[in-house]
Amino acid sequence: MSWIVYVLRCRDGSLYTGMTNDLDRRLTAHRAGKGGAYTRSRLPVRLVYTERRRGRGAALSREAAIKRLSRAAKLTLVTRGR
């Protein structure tokens, strides 16, 4: 099963990184204020980056790696990834 690592841009300009095996369902949850406490208080959110991984473990590792990046590096990833 493939997993998706994604980055959202929140209303305040912050970036949220997550992972899911059903991107449409997860985005719907985020936009409804049920996706997580961080995004709930920063609606609306916009999807700005996605990356597919083959397994859950690979997605978890990539999500963690992106979360460790500086904001500048995340913005570069988002800009070059599209």
Over which residues does each language-model region extend?
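GIY-YIG nuclease catalytic motif and its immediate N-terminal context
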Residues: 1-82
